[in-house]
C-alpha cells in the first residue's frame, strides 16, 4: 500500500537540514577551518597593528631655546658654487672671509652639471651653492646632513633638540643661509647686517599635551575588521549556489522541502557559528590593546550583528547567481568595496553627517561607522560602554539598530528574490505575488477532468495508441493533454515538445523512449514542476503542474530520480538516505528501518559508510534511485535510472521497481530497449517532441516489429544454401540477417507464425544440414524503435535545454545500405607503403604541427607563460623607473612664507596658521607690521610668554630692540620641518626691506642625490637575475609536458598502436619546445641586459653565456620530458613541476649567494654540485658568474675568485646532461611507453627482444566448460602449428595476471590478487569476438595487456602473425586499431585535424588522406562536425570519431572497448552497423568488450563471458542461449471481451502444454509465463499447440521467445561474488563503474 500524502512540519525539516549543514561543515574542513581562522587571524593581526602603532600621547612641553648660531658647525666645509661671475664671486668672498673666516673653503664650478659631477666624488662635508640670480640661490647639502623629506609637517614623536626641524640650526644650514643673505644685503645696500643675523636666536615652541592619532593604522584596523567576517558569507554563498548549481535545492523542494526550512537551517547554523566567533573575538579584543577600555558585551553585539548581517547579505546575493565560482568572489569584492566606502565616510571630516546614515542599509558601512565610534571613545580613555551608547557624533545605539534592521532586510530580500528571479529550473512567482489573496489562501481548487478521448483529441487511437484494459479505466494518474514546450536558442525558437497527449495509469510502469533530444527529460521536468509548459495541460491526480500551489500538493506524492545524481558529496550513503527520508516526512521512528530496507533492496550495505563523492557512477545512480523510492511515494519519476550501471545492478533496480509497482505510478526514461521491454508495461515512444506510439511490448512488436529471429548454431560442414532454401520453402518471406562460420540468423515475419511449426519440424528431420541447435526469439524493442525513427522527420534540431546534455547528432536520411557501401570502401583502404625514414620524417612534422596547435589553443598554458613573462617584464620596468625616479625623489623646496603661514583673509588650512608676533621692545613695531603686510603674511599679536596657550601655531617671532635694529628670536613648531629656514628667510628679507630694497631674497633647499651606488646596482642585478631564473624555470612544464596529458587521456597509447615511432614523437615535440624556450629566454635575457647598462660585455665571457644557453635549453626540455612520466602519481603535473622548478631555482640561488659571504670554497662546492645535479641551475649559475665578472669598474686583478672557474662548469654540464637525458628518456620510454608496433630507427633498445615470460601449464580445472577447454586446446594446437593455412589475427595463450595487494602491509604479509586466470582464446580474421563480464571480471586487464599498458605475469599474446614479445620485424602488421573506453581525443583539436594526425602517423599520403576523410565523413555522418573542436562535440560523435580513428589504415587487429558508450539507440544502431560492415572483408579481426548484451548480440560472431578472471563460456550467441538459457518466455494478449472463466481455462491449457510453466505478474488482458527449457522438447510442437490454443481461445496475439543473452549473463555472473571472497580474485568490482564517471550516458 502506498504511503499517504506526506505533510512534514517546517521545524522538523529545519532540524534535519541543520544536521546536514553541520555535517557538511565538519567534512569540508578546508573551508570550515578558513571560516574560523581567518577572522582570528585578522583579529590578531589588528591587535599587532594596534600594538605597533599605538596612539601617541605627548605630555606638555615648555619652550626650548637652542644654542646660539655657531659658525663652527660648518667647520672644514668645502663650499662649491656656480656660476662664477663677479657678483657671485663677491658674495662668496664675503661669506668665506668676512662672515665665516677659517671655517670654509670655496671652489668655483662653471655650471651646475660640473658641480653635481664633483659631488659624486666628494665627502659629505661638500656643500653646493647655485645662484639663479643675484637675489635667489639654492643650497645643496648631502641628504645625510639635512632632512630630505618632501612632507612639510612631521610627527612630535621623539622630537627634541635633534628633531628634523632643529637640524637646520645645528648642522649649519641656517648659518650658511644667514651668511649668504647678509652678503647679498651688503652687496645691495653696502650695509652689513651680519651681526644682527648672527644674533638671531632659535627657540623650539612649547606644545600642549596631546593624543596624536595615526590615520593609516586606524584605516587598516577599520577595513580589516570589515573583511574579517567575509569568509562566512563567502563560503555560505558558495555552498548555497553549489547546491542550486547541482539542482539539489529544486529536487529537495520536489521531495517536499519548505523554503522556510531551507533558509532557516543556514541562518541558524551560521548564527550559532558567528555567535561563538563574535564572543571569542570580543573577549580577545577587549583583553588586548585593540579595545581595552570597552565593554566586551558592547563589542560582542557589534561583532555579532555585523557577522549576521554580512552572512544575510551573502544570502541575498545567492538568487542572483547560477555559478558557485562567481558568487564567492563577488561577495568578497562587494564587501571590500562597501568597506572602503564606509572608510571614506569616516576619514573625510567634511563629509555631511546628514548623508552618513543614508549608507546604513550597507551593513559594511554601518559597522565601520560603529567601530570608528568605538575607536573614538577609546582615544579619550572612555571606551564603548552601555553608558555612552547614545553619545558622540555617530551614536553606537544607531549602528546596533541599523545592523539588526539590515539583517532582517537582507533575509526578506533573499527569500523574495529566490521566488521571483527566473532560474534554470523551478516555477517562478510574479513580482507582487505576496499581495495576491491566493498566496495567503490555501483553498484547493477543483478542475474538470478530461476524458481520454478529449485528451488525445485528434489522435487515432487505433493507429498508435493501444487501448488499455477495462481494469485501468478510471485509474488515470497522470494526464497529459496538448503539452508544448518551446524555448529560445540564440536566435531561433526550438520546440522541445509538440502537442504531446497521453495518459499514465496507476499500477503500471510506463517507459518513455526516444533518442537524445526528443523531449523525454523535458516532459519529466514539467511533470515534477521544474519547468512550466509553454502550452497545454498536465495533471497529477487532479493537481495541475502549472499551478505552483497545486504542484506543492502533487510533490508530496512524488519520488524523483533526475538525470543528475541527487546527493550531498561529503555525506555517506546512509546519511544521505536518512536526511532525505526525514525531509520527505517519514516518521522518525521508521527512518532507520526504511533506510536499511532501501540499502538491502539495492545491495548497498557494503558502501553505506562511503561518502557520495567517492562512489562510482553506477553507485551514485543506485543512491539516487534509493532516494527516489524512500517512503514508498505514490508516483516515481525516474530519468534514466540505470545509466552507468552494470547489468547486475540494473537487474537489482528492475526487481525493486517491479516489486513496488502495485497501486503506484512509475514513469522512467531509458536508452536501453531491453530495459523497457522487460520492465515497462506500457512504452511511449517520443520523436521530435511528438508521440509516435503508446502500448505494451507485444502491441509494439506485432505492429512495428520485423517478426521473429531464428538463430542457428551450425557446424563447419553446414550446407548454408540448402538450409536457406529449406527455410524459404516453408516461409518464403524469410530473410537472412547474419551469417558467419558458426551461426545463421533469419527473420521470420509475424504473419507466418502458423507456418513456424512446419519449419521447425523440417529442421528437426533434416539434421544432416549441419544445424547443431536452433532457437527463436521475438523481435526486440530496438527494432521497433528503429523502424519508428526511420519514418520520423529528422530535418531539424530537436532537443531540450532542460536535459543539460549535448545533442546527439542525427544521421541523415540516407539508407543504411549506402552507409554499408561507404564502409566497405573504407575497409579496403590501406596505409601507404613508405620507407621507415620517410615515415619518420612525416611523423616528426605531424607531431610538431599537432603540438604547436595544442599549445596555441590550450589557453591555460599560454596564459601561464605569458603571465610569467609579464611579471618579469613588469618587475624590470618597475625597477628601472624606481632607479631613475629615485634621483628625483626629493623635489627642491622653496623656503618661502607660503609654506606655513596664511595670507591675510585666508582661513586656517591643515598646518598653515598665522604668524605669532611678540613685541618685546617696549615700543611700537609698526614698521615690522608693515613689512609683514608687504610680504602677504597674516600676523597675530601675542603678549604672553607661554606659547602653549596660543597653540597650535606654526611659528612665532619675538622682536627685541638692539643697538642698530631689531634682533629676533625665531620660535618654531618642531613638527614644521622647514619652519626655521623659512623664518630665517623672513628675517633676512625684513632687514632688506628696512634698508629700502623692495626685492626679496629667495632660497631653495635642493639636496644632492647621488647616482645609485655600485653595491645597490649589484644587488638589484642579482635580484633580477635570480628572478629570471625562478620565472624562466617555471615555464617549460607548461609547454613541454604535453606527454603527461597524452598519457592521461591514453592518446599516446593510441598513437603508438597506430604505428608512431617513439623517437619521432619526442623529436616532433622538441622541434616546437626548444625554439619556443629559446625565444622566451632570449627575450628575458635581452630585457635584463637592456635595462642594465652597467655591465661590460667581455666577449669571451659573453660567449660563455651563449654557449651555455645553446645546451641549457634542450637540456631543460629533455629533463621536462622525463619528469612528465610522473603523470601516474601527480594529478596536476604541469602546475606541480612548475612549482618544483621555481622553488628549486630559488633554493639554489639562496644557498649559493648566502654562502658567498662565508667563504669562496663553500660557494664553489655548492655551485659545482648544483650544476651537476640540478639541470635547471647551470644557466642561472653562469649568468650570476658573468654578472660578477662584468662590472664596468671592477678591478682588473681580483683575488677573491676567478669567474672563469665557475663559468666553465656551468657551460660544460648542460652538454653532458643532454646526452644523459636522451638515454634516460629512451629508458623511460621503454618502461612506461607501452608497445611499439613499428621498429624505431633511433630508439633501438625499444625493439630488442623482451625478457621471456614464464609459460607454465595452467592448473587442471575439472569444472571448466567444455567449450572453453576446446578453445584452449585449439590455441595450443595453433601455437605449435608451423604450416597452418591461416593463423588467427589475435591469439591469447594462458594469459595470467596477478597484482600485489597492499592491504596486508601492517601484517607483514604480501598477498596477491588474480586479475586473469590462464585465459586462452583466439579471434579469426573476419571475426568479431565479444568479451563480456561483470565488474572486476578481468576484461580491462585483457585489453590493457593486448595494447601493452600492462605486462602479463605469464602467458603469451600473438597479434597478426607474430607474438607480442617477438623481435621479428614482420611487415604484416603496421598498426593496430584501438577504440578505448575513454575517448583519447585532444579537446582543442578539430575532427579533421585528428584524422590528419592519425592518417599521417599511419603513413598515408596527403592525397589518400583527403579521400579517406571524405569517405569516413560520408559513412559516419561526420561532415558537419569536421571543423568543430572535440570539446564542443556530443558524446556520440566522439565515439564515432574514436571508432573511425581505430579503422584508419586498414589495421589487421582492432580492439573495441565499449565503442557505443554514451550513444542513444539510433546512434548505437548506426555504430553497430558500421562495425559489422567494416569487418566483412575477412582480412581483419576485432575484440569487443561491452556491458550491453544487445550490442554483443547485434555485432559479435562469438561471445566469451568472463567471471572472476576466468572464461566461463565461449561460443555463438545462439549456442550460449541453448546451452545456458533457463527456458522460454510466453506472453499472451487476450481480447477485451474475454471472461475470467475463459482465462482460467486458458491458463489450464498452458499448464497442459508446458507442465512446469509459472505465471508471471500480469494483467487481465495480458498473461505472461516463464517456461522451463525442459518443457520445450520441440519448438515445432510448441508452436503447433500454441497456434491451436490461439484458434480455440480468445487470444489476439502471442509471443514465444528464447531466453535472452542478458538472462544468460546474469545467471553466469551470480557466482563471482562468492568466488571473489574465497579464491582471492581481484576484487575490483567497482572498476567498471568508476570508469563510467567519465562517460556521458544519455
UniProtKB/Swiss-Prot annotation:
One of its GO terms (molecular function) is ATP binding. Glycans are attached at residues 86, 388, 458, 919, 996. The keyword Oxidoreductase does not apply. It is a multi-pass membrane protein. SUPFAM superfamilies: P-loop containing nucleoside triphosphate hydrolases. Pfam families: ABC2_membrane_3, ABC_tran, R1_ABCA1. Its EC number is 7.6.2.-. Keywords: ATP-binding, Cell membrane, Endosome, Glycoprotein, Golgi apparatus, Lipid transport, Lysosome, Membrane, Nucleotide-binding, Repeat, Translocase, Transmembrane, Transmembrane helix, Transport. N-glycosylated. Cholesterol efflux transporter in macrophages that is responsible for APOAI/high-density lipoproteins (HDL) formation at the plasma membrane under high cholesterol levels and participates in reverse cholesterol transport. May play a role in the processing of autolysosomes. Belongs to the ABC transporter superfamily. ABCA family. This is Cholesterol transporter ABCA5. It comes from Mus musculus. The gene is Abca5.
